[in-house]
Amino acid sequence: MSDVSNEAARRRTFAIISHPDAGKTTLTEKLLLFGGAIQMAGSVKGRKAARHATSDWMALEKERGISVTSSVMQFPYEGKIVNLLDTPGHADFGEDTYRVLTAVDSALMVIDVAKGVEERTIKLMEVCRLRDTPIMTFINKLDREGKNPIDLLDEVETVLGIQCAPVTWPIGMGQRLKGVVHLISGEVHLYEQGRNFTRQDSTIFPSLDAPGLAEKIGEQMLTELRDELELVQGASNPFDLDAYRAGQQTPVFFGSGVNNFGVQPLLDFFIEHAPPPQTRETTGRRVAPSETKLSGFVFKIQANMDPQHRDRVAFMRVCSGKFTAGMKTLHVRSGKDVKLANALTFMASDREIAAEAWPGDVIGIHNHGTISIGDTFTEGESLSFTGIPNFAPELFRRARLRDPLKLKQLQKGLAQLSEEGATQFFRPLMSNDLILGAVGVLQFDVVAYRLKDEYGVDAIFEPVSVTTARWVHCDNVKKLDEFREKNAGNLGIDAAGQLVYLAPTRVNLQLAQERAPDVRFSATREHAHAKAID
């Protein structure tokens, strides 16, 4: 095997998805803890001790205790390299999560034992389904009372439409929690509360028949457990690697992230069975990770990761070949050669200069406004990775300054923050309004906060008469010009220079579509085909 094939085979690149408050950020911390990437996990709730979760690095996230940007963290474990992409925990940031899911090879779904499958989980699962992403499931908060585990499996299968294969099974729950049984190895892991946020190895018995186990958990509970396991193993599906990798079956684990319990079996199983980097589609052909020439695509842009440097970083997933510091690449969309100097690797907000990177790795490229989400970099071949869309926003607001002299800073701030993809910035052709589009109200709060914190701009967002937006295209230049002339009052330009129809009502949009049959109105814009404004 070549170096590229060997290194690609070692990579495990995945994202964690969940409904808000299911314990995703805490579990992220504990995976890092067990992976040896951090010595002490920070509790998101532990405000007085000034402990904040490693993956919640932005000031606003630390204040609110929610993840609103996706972090990238890498750590070695058992001879493999794990790339963990944390996703926004808030529903308003679903588009960012969608794009993160285009950059991973598998996902870990976290479910609250008391709440079961929630609305956000359903939506995220639909996104994973589009790509047949392999998914493992961690049922969290076992230290609290919750739903019957058998009912939970049934709920996952019925609501999410995916077969469950339990790998660990709980012994009790809440106050009666004693541990979990590993259904494949037969081992029993006893529950001990994690203290001081440091890793603790649980006591493990080799089987249910091991001497001393009955004393630990009680004869009655052991008898109940044997009966329950007989029922579970008779009614559930055994783990099938092919079905899991095809996105048809999810291995299920039980545990308590906050108490470091049940995390180790999950991590070990993940390392052994999760897929390495896979072949990916481009506009021209399929690209295999084992190819020797570098290729990769940008799935996220983050402004001001280091407030002292006012920098913008483009996150690029390496799809094939080897990245080396300072190498020359082709920025396919612009057709220009770009030297990738000072690329970064990440441990949440800790950054290091990347000497090399392989398929499955994520590197950060310094961006001075020339890189967009969806851009492809290669060693010369003109191809673009597909399937990284921009969705039409559902809410629109006009930005208004409290200090009119700060207009330039406002324009710069809105343009740079919209590059990240969570919001979209539009300039109407016939007015000087600056319009921001988003899929949720929280995004306007975040932008207002960051404008003030990072750009020194005090802006408010007020209602504007725009209900929806559609990107417009027409192969006939003359007909497009006619359309622009007739509809100038409803047209604008997005941050990438694309023409957008800003409809005041859905009826208005319908009429515009009927009157211009040659013009295509699109609810999404594929980043791969976007043109940047100079």
UniProtKB/Swiss-Prot annotation:
- State the UniProt keywords alphabetically: Cytoplasm, GTP-binding, Nucleotide-binding, Protein biosynthesis
* Gene Ontology CC entries for this record: cytosol
Q: Which residues form the tr-type G domain?
A: 9-278
Q: Which residues bind GTP?
A: 18-25, 86-90, 140-143
Mind listing the GO molecular function terms for this protein? GTP binding; GTPase activity; guanosine tetraphosphate binding; translation release factor activity, codon nonspecific; translation release factor activity, codon specific
Write out the GO biological process terms. regulation of translational termination
Q: Which CDD domains match?
A: RF3, RF3_II, RF3_III
Signal peptide segment: none
A Pfam family recorded for this sequence: RF3_C
Q: Where in the cell is it found?
A: Cytoplasm
Family classification:
Belongs to the TRAFAC class translation factor GTPase superfamily. Classic translation factor GTPase family. PrfC subfamily.
Q: Which HAMAP family match?
A: Rel_fac_3
What does this chain do? Increases the formation of ribosomal termination complexes and stimulates activities of RF-1 and RF-2. It binds guanine nucleotides and has strong preference for UGA stop codons. It may interact directly with the ribosome. The stimulation of RF-1 and RF-2 is significantly reduced by GTP and GDP, but not by GMP.
Under the heading NCBIfam families, the entry gives: prfC (TIGR00503), PRK00741.1 (NF001964), small_GTP (TIGR00231)
What is the name of this protein? Answer: Peptide chain release factor 3
Please give the organism: Xanthomonas oryzae pv. oryzae (strain MAFF 311018)
What's the encoding gene here?
Answer: prfC
